[in-house]
C-alpha cells in the first residue's frame, strides 16, 4: 500500500500530487485526468470514433433537476446539453454547472479509490485500500458498535446527491433529524397554512408571477440561485408585475428588479410589523378573507393565552397509523357570532366577529384579531424605519402596494432565514398575508419560490420496499445537538459533507474526534472526508454499472437516469455499496439485486395508476423524460382556501408559543449582529452567507472551469477596505472568538457598509487557509426546540473582523 499526506487526501487545487507514490495512492494514473494538458489532441481524418447519446438529470440541491442530453465519444463524456425531448421549451434547462461536468467529473476533486485513515483525524493522512478490505472493516465496526451499544449507536446522514436511501433503515440506524438549515422562515410561516414542511415551500410556481401586480422579494436572490428558471422573473416583469427586492446588498436579483430597497440585516420582521401597522391603520385589510378563512375571529382565554376549543385535544391515529391531535372538526374552535353575539363553534356561523371580549366557561375570552391589535401598540411605521433603515414613507408605499394585490411575497433561504430571529419574520409574514388575503388566488403566494422542482407538479413515485422489520431507529436528537449533548452515537456514516452543516466548526470537529468510527461516502473529497476513518468513492449522476440507475421527479416531468459512462476510477454506485454492506451484515436479499429492479419498483409501486402503468422502457424511448399530467398549466396552491391546518383556515395564533411570548409574532433582535452589541467594537462586520451561481452549496468548488471565474473571497464595501488600509486582492484574516480563516478580499460597492459577504461553505482546500465555518454562529435558541423543525442554525448572525494576513 501507498500512503498520501496532503491538504485534501491527494486531491486539492494546490496540486497535491507530490510524486509517483501519491498519484498511485488515489489511482491517478489515468493520463490527462489531473491537468488540462491531456485534454486536446490532433484529430485524424481516418480515425473511427464511437459516439453515442444518453440521458440523465443533474443536481437536486439547487432545485433545478435539469434533464440532460449527454454526448459520449470513445467512452468519455464530451458534451452536456439540455434534453431536447422535454414537452415544453421552458423545461429544457441547463446552467454553467451542468455544462462544466464535461471537466468536473474527471477533475482532481474525485475520490478515485477507497481510502483508509492512517494519521490523526483532520490531518488528512490516508492510504489506498481495496474495496474488500474497506467494506469488511466497516461492516465489522458496525457489528461491534451495534452489539455493544445497540442498533441506534449508528447514525446515517445522507443528502439528495448521494443515493444511499436504504442504509438507515437497513441498519436500524438513527438519522440526522432536524437540520437547522433553510428552516428559519418556514418555522414561523408554515404552521399558519399547513404547507411547506418547515421549509417555506408553500408557494405556487413562479410561473404564476405573471398574474401578480407586485412580486416582493425579501431575503431571496432568485436570479442568482435559480438559474434554470430565471426566465420566469423576466416574464413576470414583462407582463407588468412590479418587481421589488428588499436586501441588505445590491444582489443580482436587486439589479434586475424595478426597485431595490436596502435593509439592515436581520430586521425583516420589523419591516413586516411596519407594513402591518400601516395596513391596519389605513383600513386596507380584507375583512371577508379574515372572517371566513383565518383564525382572526377565534377566541383566546386571556388568562392562559390558549385558544378556546370544545375540549382538550385528544390524540387520534390516522389511516397510516400515525398519532396526531384531533382536528377542528372533531374539536372545534370558538368564535362570536356577529349577528347574535353568542359564542359558537366556528363552523356554525358564516359571519364571525373579528373583535369582541366576552365571558365564556368562566373565563374572559377575546378574539385573535383584538390581541393582534393590542400587540401592534408596540410598533409604528417610524419604529420600523428606525430598526430597518428603510424610510417610513417607503414602508407605507410598500404596504399599500402589497395590500392592493394580487401580490406574491417571495422569501428565501438566505438573508434573515440564517439569523436567529427568522421564525419571528416568518410568523409576521403570515400575519401580513392573512390580513390582506394575498394567498390562494392567481398572482398571490408566500414562501420560497427558488428551485423550480420544489413547487412544481410532481408524480407520486413509489420505491423499493424493505422488509417490514427493517426500520430506522427513532432519532435521539438532531445531529447538531449530538455535538454537545450526550447521545448513543458511536458510528457515523455520512453521505454528505457533515462538517459544513453546522456553525462553529471547532465544536463539529471535536465531536467528530469523539466518535468511534466515521465513514464518508461521496464522489468528491470534501471537508468532512478529512475526519473519516474510511472514504468511499461513489459514482456521479453520469456513471453507472447498469443501463439505468434511478427515477426522480424533475421540473414538471419524470426523469430517468441512464448510464452515460462506466464508473470512473474505482468508484462504485451507491446501490452496489449498500448491497455489499448488506451482504456482510446478513441481509443482502432485502435490497434490489439490480438497479433495473429498483427503477421498475419506483414506477410499479406508485399508488397513481398513471404512474404504475408506465414503464421504464417508455421513459427511455422518450429520451429519459416523461411529462407529468397537468404540467402545461401553472401549479397553484390553496385555490379553494383549504388550508392544511386543524381548522382548515390560515392560523396565525400559535398557542404552543405562549410561554415564549410568541403566540402572535413579537419583535426580537438577532442574537449577535445587533448594532448595539458590545462585540461590535471588536468584530464590527456582519458576515452574511449567500448562495451563488458558481456552486450548489459546497459542490463545484473543485470544478476547474468554474474556478477560472471565482475563488473564495470575502466582499466588503470599499470604505471598509480604506479604514483598514486594505486593497482589493489582499489576503486577509477573517476572525472572531470562535476561530479564523484566510481568503482574498474584494471591495464591492453593492455590499452594505458594516457587512461582509461570502458565498457559502468555502472549504479549507479552496481558501488560503481554514474553513469558513470556523467563525459562524451555532447558538440555538431555546424557543427553537418548540418550533416545527427545531432551532435554526444562525450562520449569518455572525460578527467578524478582517485584517491583512
What do these predicted ranges mean?
Residues 215-218, 256-257, 364-365, 379-382, ...:
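Flexible glycine/proline-enriched surface loops and loop-helix/loop-strand junctions
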Residues 419, 574-619, 698-700, 704-715, ...:
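Long, contiguous, secondary-structure-rich segments that constitute the structural scaffold
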Residues 27, 284-289, 395, 409-410, ...:
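Acidic/polar loop patches that form or flank catalytic/metal-binding clefts of enzymes
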Residues 113, 117-133, 284-392, 564-651, ...:
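N-terminal leader/propeptide and maturation segments of large enzyme subunits in energy/redox metabolism
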Residues 153-160, 384-390, 413-420, 452-453, ...:
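Conserved short loop/turn motifs at secondary-structure junctions
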Residues 2-3, 165-234, 239-245, 270, ...:
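Extended redox/cofactor-interaction regions of prokaryotic respiratory oxidoreductases
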Residues 206, 542-567, 577, 582-587:
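Glycine/threonine-rich phosphate-binding loop and adjacent beta-strand/alpha-helix elements that clamp
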Residues 2-288, 292-353, 364, 382-383, ...:
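N-terminal export/assembly segments and adjacent metallocofactor-ligating motifs
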Amino acid at each position: 500500500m501507498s500512503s498520501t499526506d496532503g491538504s485534501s487526501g491527494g486531491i486539492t487545487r494546490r496540486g497535491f500530487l507530490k510524486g509517483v507514490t501519491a498519484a498511485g495512492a488515489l489511482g491517478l494514473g489515468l493520463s490527462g485526468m489531473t491537468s488540462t494538458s491531456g485534454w486536446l489532441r490532433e484529430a485524424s481524418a481516418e480515425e473511427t470514433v464511437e459516439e453515442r447519446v444518453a440521458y440523465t438529470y443533474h443536481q437536486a440541491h439547487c432545485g433545478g433537476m435539469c434533464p440532460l442530453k449527454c454526448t459520449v465519444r470513445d467512452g468519455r463524456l464530451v458534451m452536456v446539453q439540455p434534453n431536447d425531448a422535454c414537452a415544453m421549451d421552458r423545461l429544457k434547462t441547463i446552467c454553467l454547472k451542468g455544462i462544466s461536468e464535461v471537466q468536473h467529473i474527471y477533475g482532481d476533486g474525485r475520490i478515485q479509490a477507497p481510502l483508509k485513515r492512517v494519521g490523526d483525524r483532520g490531518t488528512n493522512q490516508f492510504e489506498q485500500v481495496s474495496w474488500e478490505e474497506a467494506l469488511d472493516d466497516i461492516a465489522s465496526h458496525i457489528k461491534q458498535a451495534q452489539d455493544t451499544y445497540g442498533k441506534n449507536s449508528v447514525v446515517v446522514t445522507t443528502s439528495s446527491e448521494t443515493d444511499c436511501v436504504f442504509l438507515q433503515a437497513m441498519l436500524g440506524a438513527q438519522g440526522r433529524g432536524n437540520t437547522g438549515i433553510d428552516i428559519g422562515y418556514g418555522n414561523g410561516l408554515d404552521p399558519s397554512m399547513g404547507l411547506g414542511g418547515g421549509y417555506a415551500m408553500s408557494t405556487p410556481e413562479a410561473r404564476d408571477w405573471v398574474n401578480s401586480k407586485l412580486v416582493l422579494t425579501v431575503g431571496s436572490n432568485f436570479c442568482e440561485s435559480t438559474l434554470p428558471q430565471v426566465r420566469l422573473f423576466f416574464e413576470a416583469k414583462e407582463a407588468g408585475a412590479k418587481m421589488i427586492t428588499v436586501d441588505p446588498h445590491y444582489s443580482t436579483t436587486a439589479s434586475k428588479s424595478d426597485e431595490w430597497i436596502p435593509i439592515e440585516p436581520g430586521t425583516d420582521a420589523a419591516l413586516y410589523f411596519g407594513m402591518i401597522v400601516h395596513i391596519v391603520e389605513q383600513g386596507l385589510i380584507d375583512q371577508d378573507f379574515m372572517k371566513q378563512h383565518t383564525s382572526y375571529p377565534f377566541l383566546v382565554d386571556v388568562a392562559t393565552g390558549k385558544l378556546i376549543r370544545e375540549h382538550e385535544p385528544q390524540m387520534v391515529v390516522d389511516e397510516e397509523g400515525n398519532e396526531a391531535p384531533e382536528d377542528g372538526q372533531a374539536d372545534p374552535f370558538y368564535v362570536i357570532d356577529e349577528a347574535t353575539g353568542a359564542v359558537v363553534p366556528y363552523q356554525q356561523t358564516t359571519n364571525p366577529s373579528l373583535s369582541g371580549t366576552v365571558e365564556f366557561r368562566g373565563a374572559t375570552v377575546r378574539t385573535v384579531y383584538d390581541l393582534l391589535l393590542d400587540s401592534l401598540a408596540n410598533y409604528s411605521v417610524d419604529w420600523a424605519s428606525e430598526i430597518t433603515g428603510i424610510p417610513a414613507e417607503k414602508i407605507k408605499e410598500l404596504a399599500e402596494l402589497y395590500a392592493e394585490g394580487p401580490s406574491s411575497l417571495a422569501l428565501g433561504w438566505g438573508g434573515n432565514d440564517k439569523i436567529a430571529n427568522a421564525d419571528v419574520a416568518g410568523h409576521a409574514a403570515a400575519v401580513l398575508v392573512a390580513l390582506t388575503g394575498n394567498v390562494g388566488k392567481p398572482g398571490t403566494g408566500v414562501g420560497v419560490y427558488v428551485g423550480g422542482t420544489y413547487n412544481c407538479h410532481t408524480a407520486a413515485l413509489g420505491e423499493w420496499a424493505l422488509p417490514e422489520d427493517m426500520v430506522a431507529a427513532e432519532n435521539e436528537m438532531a445531529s447538531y445537538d449530538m455535538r454537545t449533548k450526550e447521545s448513543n452515537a458511536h458510528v457515523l456514516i455520512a453521505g454528505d459533507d457533515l462538517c459544513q452543516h453546522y456553525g462553529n466548526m471547532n465544536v463539529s470537529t471535536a465531536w467528530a474526534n469523539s466518535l468511534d468510527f466515521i465513514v464518508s461516502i461521496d464522489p468528491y473529497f470534501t471537508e468532512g472526508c478529512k475526519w473519516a476513518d474510511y472514504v468511499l468513492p461513489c459514482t456521479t449522476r453520469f456513471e453507472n454499472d447498469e443501463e439505468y440507475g434511478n427515477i426522480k421527479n424533475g421540473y414538471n416531468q419524470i426523469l430517468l437516469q441512464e448510464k452515460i459512462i462506466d464508473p470512473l476510477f474505482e468508484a462504485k454506485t451507491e446501490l452496489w455499496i449498500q448491497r455489499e454492506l448488506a451482504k456482510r451484515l446478513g441481509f443482502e436479499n432485502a435490497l434490489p439485486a439490480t438497479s433495473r429492479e429498483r427503477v421498475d419498483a419506483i414506477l410499479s409501486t406508485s399508488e397513481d395508476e398513471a404512474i404504475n402503468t408506465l414503464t421504464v422502457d417508455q421513459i427511455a424511448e422518450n429520451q429519459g423524460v416523461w411529462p407529468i399530467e397537468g404540467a402545461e398549466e401553472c401549479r397553484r396552491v390553496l385555490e379553494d382556501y383549504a388550508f392544511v391546518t386543524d381548522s382548515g383556515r390560515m392560523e396565525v395564533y400559535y398557542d404552543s408559543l405562549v410561554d415564549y411570548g410568541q403566540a402572535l409574532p413579537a419583535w426580537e433582535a438577532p442574537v449577535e449582529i445587533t448594532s448595539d452589541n458590545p462585540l461590535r467594537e471588536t468584530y464590527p462586520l456582519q458576515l452574511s452567507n449567500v448562495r451563488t451561481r458558481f456552486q450548489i452549496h459546497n459542490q463545484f468548488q473543485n470544478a476547474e472551469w468554474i474556478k477560472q471565474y471565482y475563488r473564495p473571497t470575502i466582499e466588503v464595501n470599499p470604505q471598509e477596505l480604506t479604514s483598514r488600509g486594505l486593497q482589493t486582492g489582499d489576503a486577509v484574516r477573517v476572525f472572531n472568538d470562535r476561530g479564523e480563516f484566510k481568503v482574498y478580499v474584494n471591495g464591492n460597492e453593492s455590499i452594505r457598509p458594516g457587512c461582509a459577504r461570502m458565498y457559502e461553505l468555502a472549504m479549507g482546500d479552496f481558501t488560503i487557509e481554514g474553513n469558513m465555518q470556523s467563525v459562524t454562529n451555532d447558538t440555538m435558541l431555546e424557543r427553537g426546540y418548540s418550533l416545527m423543525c427545531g432551532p435554526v442554525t444562525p450562520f449569518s448572525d455572525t460578527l467578524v473582523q478582517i485584517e491583512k494576513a
